[in-house]
Amino acid sequence: MSNKLFRLDAGYQQYDWGKIGSSSAVAQFAAHSDPSVQIEQDKPYAELWMGTHSKMPSYNHESKESLRDIISKNPSAMLGKDIIDKFHATNELPFLFKVLSIEKVLSIQAHPDKALGKILHAQDPKNYPDDNHKPEMAIAVTDFEGFCGFKPLQEIADELKRIPELRNIVGEETSRNFIENIQPSAQKGSPEDEQNKKLLQAVFSRVMNASDDKIKIQARSLVERSKNSPSDFNKPDLPELIQRLNKQFPDDVGLFCGCLLLNHCRLNAGEAIFLRAKDPHAYISGDIMECMAASDNVVRAGFTPKFKDVKNLVSMLTYTYDPVEKQKMQPLKFDRSSGNGKSVLYNPPIEEFAVLETTFDEKLGQRHFEGVDGPSILITTKGNGYIKADGQKLKAEPGFVFFIAPHLPVDLEAEDEAFTTYRAFVEPN
């Protein structure tokens, strides 16, 4: 068997927020790719992990050897010398590729950058198991909604004026100081911009450090307001969102730090957002492809029963305040492929990964891809077809995952009209 292209078995996580039973794409993919997986219809299936992360590594489908071990035996062939030199790793991929199926809101969270990741890992390896940063990209496979980054300053000022419950938590002095002193049109990086960020940090800190009793009282009042006076809110979808998330996490601080301070983002299938390290975000519902730097570090803020590290969270965030449209990514044309179907590239402004989506709208269509200068992982998400490389022709069905070595030309062939694949890869430049 060639060691340049081979099928992988990917593990799955059953976090509470995952879609239930067969409604989950994660469950469907896991069961279709491994007939021994019996879907439990009352259990959540949240994440499919594809990569070398030690928490849930992928395995060669035939030999059952871990991808991590396969790479460590021949890193120059599996990663490429330039990738080894750049990321200083000889047994792991610099990215982690996932499918997420989201039924309930995930915790509002942010991820440390590289410098802070090393510090937190050294201080508290239990809660911060990695020393790396974790920028992420999410591509919607179905309709998706989430929180991403702080709202523009004027929107937050309007919330403080219109929603007494938020003002009660933030406090009169901090609220007034924010409303009167923000400069929404400040240039990025200017002293005025830095002052804006300090004002926003003060508001967020007051919310995150409010007592549980205060949050509980004000949350119940906020939910009643959303039912009885929906016009008090500056966005028409906010009252419904508050009520829905309150059913999932009653009286939670996330109703304030999420619904009222963060952008509420909706993506149609094919749209994507990039989430920088140290930017607050949370996924609310939908199915997504997610790619990230290889880390599992999370600093949580709300909508979670898990450990909340409020002190580090408040101090580490960037406090950028862009509208949600600025965080969306435009797919790019991918010039190194030809033939039937369509390939688009999602290329975030970081060095660890990019993701290529390929779709076919006709049976028996074929598309050729030149080799890329680093390792890849490819998953089929819809339809049936084949992946061909290095003299092999392997069946590709929903949930089937493959490793592709550097510099290897690949062909995809559609057996069905709606054949779709996603390919995460890294290159040195």
Curated annotation (Swiss-Prot):
Gene Ontology MF term list: mannose-6-phosphate isomerase activity; zinc ion binding
Please name the CDD domains in this protein's record: cupin_PMI_type_I_N (cd07011)
Task: Give the binding site residues for Zn(2+).
Answer: Q109, H111, E136, H281
Tell me where in this chain the PTM N-acetylserine is found: S2
Subcellular location(s): the record lists: Cytoplasm
Keywords for this protein: Acetylation, Cytoplasm, Isomerase, Metal-binding, Phosphoprotein, Zinc
Its primary localisation, in coarse terms, equals cytoplasm
**Top-level enzyme category:** isomerase
Expression is induced as follows: By D-mannose.
Gene Ontology CC terms, in alphabetical order? cytoplasm; cytosol; nucleus
Reactions catalysed, semicolon-separated, are: D-mannose 6-phosphate = D-fructose 6-phosphate
Describe cofactor binding as the record notes it.
Binds 1 zinc ion per subunit.
Q: Which Pfam families match?
A: PMI_typeI_C, PMI_typeI_cat, PMI_typeI_hel
Gene Ontology biological process terms from the UniProt entry: carbohydrate metabolic process; cell wall mannoprotein biosynthetic process; GDP-mannose biosynthetic process; protein glycosylation
The keyword Heme belongs to this UniProt entry's keyword annotation: no
Q: Which residues carry this modification: Phosphoserine?
A: S107
What protein family does this chain belong to? Belongs to the mannose-6-phosphate isomerase type 1 family.
- For this entry, the protein name equals Mannose-6-phosphate isomerase
Native organism is Saccharomyces cerevisiae (strain ATCC 204508 / S288c)
